[in-house]
Structure formats: structure tokens, C-alpha cells
Amino acid sequence: DGTVLTSRSNDRFLGEEEREVAFKGTLARLCPNLRIIDASGGSGVHVQTSRIMQSIIAGLDHVRAVYSMGGGNTAILNALEQNGSLPDVYVAHDLDNDNRRLIEDGRLSFVLHHDLRVDLQNVFQAFLHHHKLMVVPLHTTMSHIQVVTPENIPPINRRF
């Protein structure tokens, strides 16, 4: 029993909708007693996400988990903390600066992360190949999903 909160940035962010559909379907099948509440639409912006959270916070009972496919995690956590509803598990996507700080502080359980540089390199190579600006055959590499916990946070790779 309890509530699982889900959050996407907005309907236009590619990949978030597919994640949400798969997650909700699996959760409904495996844990039918959990109530799923959607807190999507803040576009990962603190103020907008805070407004959305304030509009739903009163109806939240025991928050067992949060699955955030988008941003705005600081706003979500702050609203839940103010309501005394911090979740048992909080899962976020992408190891950006905000999520890095939150996981270092122990406020996130884990972050699902993939290397955006590999994804961008694939897009750039496909562009070059399409316009016949690359003579070698197109070879794409899948970016591997990493599960980042407070115990295995990778070092920051900065390029100058």
C-alpha cells in the first residue's frame, strides 16, 4: 500500500513518455495496491515544478517512491519534505549538476544515467554519413545505462 509519484518534464521530451508507460504498466502488474500519482509538466524548472507539487501535495498519503524521468528533483524533494512525505526510494534520470548534488547529499536513492556524449557523437556521425561527409562506414555505439548510487558516483569529467 502507499503512493508512487511519477514526474516527467513535459509531453515534448523524447523518451520520457515511453519510460512512464513502461514503468506504470509494470508497477500496476507487479504491485496493484500502489497508487500512482502523476506530477508531470514542470519542464524541469524549479518554480513550475514547485507549483505542480503544491497542487497535489495535500492528496498524497504514504509516498513509498518517486520515479522522476525529468528534472525538477530539488523542487519535488523540497515539497515532499515540507509535507513530511519523503519517499523510501527516489529514482532520477541523468547525472546533471542538480542530481549529482542530490545524490552526494543522500537525497536520491539512485540515478539512471547514460553518456550523452556517446549519443551526441552518434547523431553527429549519422549527420556526416547522411551528407556523405564521412568516408568510413557508419558505426554507432550504444550508450550504456549506469546505475549511480551514493556509493559509486563517477568523477566529474570536464573538458577545457
Label the predicted regions:
Residues 1-2, 49-50, 99, 115-132:
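Hydrophobic alpha-helical segments within soluble ligand-binding/sensing domains
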Residues 23, 37-98:
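Hydrophobic alpha-helical
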Residues 96-104, 108:
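Flexible loop/hinge segments that line or gate small-molecule binding clefts
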Residues 5-7, 67-68, 148:
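Short hydrophobic segments within beta-strands
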Residues 105-117:
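Short beta-strand elements at the ligand-binding edges of bilobed clamshell
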Residues 11, 27, 118-160:
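Hinge/cleft segment of the Venus flytrap/periplasmic-binding protein
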Residues 14-34, 48, 52, 75-76, ...:
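Short, solvent-exposed amphipathic alpha-helices that sit
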Residues 2-12:
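Short beta-strand segments enriched in small/hydrophobic residues
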